[in-house]
From Swiss-Prot:
Coiled-coil residue spans: none
Originating species: Porphyromonas gingivalis (strain ATCC BAA-308 / W83)
EC class name: ligase
Superkingdom as given in the UniProt entry: Bacteria
UniProt-recorded name of the protein: GMP synthase [glutamine-hydrolyzing]
Subunit (UniProt): Homodimer.
Ranges where the Glutamine amidotransferase type-1 domain occurs: 4-192
Name of the encoding gene: guaA
One example GO MF annotation: ATP binding
Amino acid sequence: MLEKLIILDFGSQTTQLIARRIRELNTYCEVYPYNKLPEDLSGVRGIILSGSPYSVYDSKAFRIELSELRGKLPLLGICYGAQSLVHQAGGKVEPCDSREYGRTHLTLRQPDDALLTGLQSGTTVWMSHGDTITSLPEGFEVIAGTEDVPNAAFRIRGEKTWGVQFHPEIYHSEEGTKLLGNFLDICGMKRDWTPASFIEATVQELRERLGDDKVILALSGGVDSSVVAVLLNKAIGRNLTCIFVDHGLLRKGEFERVLQDYEHLGLNVIGVNAKEKFFAALSGVTDPEQKRKIIGRGFIEVFDEEARKLKDIKWLGQGTIYPDVIESLSITGMVIKSHHNVGGLPERMNLRLVEPLRMLFKDEVRRVGLELGMMPHLIHRHPFPGPGLGIRILGEITEEKATILQNADDIYMSLMREWGLYDQVWQAGAILLPVRSVGVMGDERTYEYTVALRAVTSMDAMSADWVHLPYDFLAKVSNEIINKVRGVNRVVYDISSKPPSTIEWE
């Protein structure tokens, strides 16, 4: 049985960073909403309680009865999680005079404590809280503190329960990963979850789950669906039929290039031209969420139609990855934006879903692909959304706009490769804005579209920083697009990071 750690999410923006750090330590973990702890805890070796935007005293704060968890499994509370342990046990948590945010130095009071093994006294940690623990309940003891936060870390005597008021998952906490590793050792984790072990377990699981059933797989040309294709092919061979849909919103020349790539992989691929269907369905639609749902529904309908042409197809494969799942539903149940792989699907489907990468982050998918021996140019391609340029054309989608954006995007990507910037950027693309502006070309006044350029660096799509591309490069791209793409007379560069912005505009 796969051993794992569970992270209970109380709404923190850094919950997924906790998961990333744990995965980096070759340990499998899963994130669950704070009130959705699985009843079956077999295989679970420990639990981490995340931070939260709330105070323990807020009426809307996310609460569970922590006494029911204490003593059963090793427990680590981070920030709000630590404060909740103290508050529920009768200790004092009070507002800070001013919010404590940023770097500080941690003094170890009990350096021999199992959670602090190997840490240096004075190590830098990252604080981010508005409340602080001022008094610990009986049975709780301080193991580390800072100048302003004397109870920065504690443990409960006689239990494998700890709390820290700083954030070990944040990069600025110098030895945060070491602390999390110590907790994994306390939990008795083997730390043997690797790409090779994932492939072995997943292929075995797919064979058991699918048996002799036939599967069709949604191909996009991106790394996610490519890795899924190779995994499924390894598990069930010719029982896999890959479906690649041209919805008219792919990058320029993408349809032909992708078909060629997959033929080289020995996959059974059917190419479907469904441009007219998608453009007709999207006509007049401007709402981003509605567009996503239409595109998602269109995909499933096309797959359903293709499945009927084939015999005995029972499963639909998809390249859903963990950030897709996490982004689709917030902790409160409020939709952030539906993802094309996990939202926008019709209620009735004639096929069951199989999503082998559902619990992997993007960088983990790439490592799995390399372990599978896939071609580097497939593995290191920039992420490209399933709805394609459909979520990069703001406002109504038309075939004319799609052509404009394809041409602009092609210039941007080609120059990025030419300048040696492509592999330095995690994701890049052009966006067609629903904004026309006045320009002058030759002696004539123009009134044409604006294109925005986007380029970000990221590890896992949960957070992203905009890339400081050279001005000379941006000037070259702008000049080429304006001169060569009919319908565009202005180019701008997006300098927004995630959060608060998302990577895609819609």
